[in-house]
Amino acid sequence: MEPRNFDTLRDHLTKDFIWPSVYMFKFIAPADNRIFALLHDLFPHQAEFTNRHSAGGKYVSITVKEMMLSAEEVIDRYEKASAIEGVIVL
């Protein structure tokens, strides 16, 4: 899998957010407990998870809210999540 370029997101986060800030991460993944567990392990237990299954039940959208200290922390989390096979970062 080719590494995703997060430069545009980095610019947006640097210009439009005041850090620290609560950031809302969004992902889409197959409805697979293993993938969800891997994604869940990237975040501390204080992070707030919301899941919504697709109509057919094959996929789940995952929203995570967490207090982040910097744009670089957000980018780092997205890079780690994008390395999980099947996870789409939004």
Predicted features and spans:
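Long, contiguous binding/interaction regions
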Residues: 1-61, 67-90
